[in-house]
Amino acid sequence: MKTQMTIPYFTIDAPYELAYRNNGTSSPARPHTHNALEIYLTMSDLPDVLLDDTVSSVSKGSLIIIPPHHVHQLFNQKLTIYERYVLNINSDWLYTVLGAGSGLMPYADPAFSPAILRLSPTGLTGLCSQLDHYLQLHPQPSLSA
């Protein structure tokens, strides 16, 4: 007999949420999906990232781009410390800003597959600097991932 897993669906109501985390958890997030584009910058190696039906090892300094409504789980090891930046952008809000069908943000389209991009050291340093600067000006502690 096959067991079917129910995938939780979360709704991101805010236009966007940005958070920096450098911690572990006693109960990692299960595989899930939501209505937001998720951009995840990992500063730690992730041994078993689930994106749709594929599990991959992702090295630190990688950018993981997950279009809305794609099943994912980025880490599942209890009490392991993971350093990361997480940006969730509500897809409805993004389409309002950019214009649906504009082609300006293809990864906001659920038809696209998740992507893993390895950043150059210079690109990684620059992106972290910009994210840190934004977080200093606009702290958003509400994101729990």
Question: What positions do the PLM features span?
Answer:
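Generic protein-terminus/edge-of-domain signal
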Residues: 1-63, 70, 103-104, 114-115
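Hydrophobic, aromatic-enriched interface-forming segments
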Residues: 144-145
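Short hydrophobic-aromatic micro-motifs
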Residues: 64-66, 87-88
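A hydrophobic/aromatic-rich effector-binding and dimerization subdomain
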Residues: 2-17, 71-140
